């Protein structure tokens, strides 16, 4: 049987690359000037991802209490609070305009302007969806420290609460893998079928993020056309 994390890394590589090269995430590959609107778009997209994945993890934990140890590693309350503060700070300082950033950035605010919001990701099972969600969540935190340093080096007062909070999540990466490898035999999930399910669900989370990025850019384009 293939190791779960080897399979996840190898079999989600294509979608991971697509996501990194999808605007607005692609701005991190460039050493250009700070793009306020793209940065705000990233924060909004990640807010939607973190809300959806935290809900999936919470539901799975309710059904399988043994997941509690890994579920706590995403630190969802701290992450969402940091996102909300950054989104509000960006708009409050007039770096860019957004009519919804006067309070907590919620799913309802997204629905107000995103009529084609992507549907929730495919799920093979609550456990595989939760573990794959945490895999994508913590995996996305690995470069957070680098992003914070790059943003702080720019001659702008850029809010970085989100990436600072994610840098904290990155510290749980090794513990997460160890805990999952200990947990799977206990749940009788140490088999090829579960590995396949987890890979499928992880790819679904990546595709969800890509869809959120596409929807955000479509929404911004539509608003620009309406204004012009």
Predicted regions and their residues:
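Metal- and O2-centered redox machinery and metal/ROS homeostasis
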Residues: 1-228
């Amino acid at each position: 049987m293939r190791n779960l994390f080897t399979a996840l890394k190898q079999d989600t590589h294509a979608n991971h690359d697509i996501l990194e090269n999808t605007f607005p995430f692609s701005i991190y590959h460039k050493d250009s000037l700070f793009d306020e609107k793209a940065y705000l778009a990233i924060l909004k997209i990640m807010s939607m991802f973190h809300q959806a994945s935290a809900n999936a993890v919470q539901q799975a934990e309710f059904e399988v209490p043994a997941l509690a140890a890994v579920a706590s590693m995403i630190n969802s309350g701290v992450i969402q609070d940091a996102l909300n503060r950054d989104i509000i700070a960006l708009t409050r300082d007039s770096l860019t305009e957004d009519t919804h950033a006067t309070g907590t950035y919620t799913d309802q605010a997204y629905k107000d302007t995103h009529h084609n919001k992507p549907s929730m990701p495919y799920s093979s099972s609550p456990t595989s969806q939760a573990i794959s969600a945490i895999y994508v969540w913590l995996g996305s935190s690995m470069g957070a420290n680098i992003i914070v340093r790059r943003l702080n080096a720019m001659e702008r007062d850029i809010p970085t609460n989100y990436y600072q909070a994610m840098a904290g999540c990155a510290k749980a990466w090794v513990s997460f893998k160890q805990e999952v490898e200990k947990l799977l035999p206990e749940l009788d999930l140490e088999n090829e079928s579960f590995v396949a399910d987890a890979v499928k669900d992880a790819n679904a989370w990546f595709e969800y993020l890509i869809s959120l990025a596409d929807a955000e850019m479509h929404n911004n384009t539509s608003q620009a056309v309406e204004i012009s």
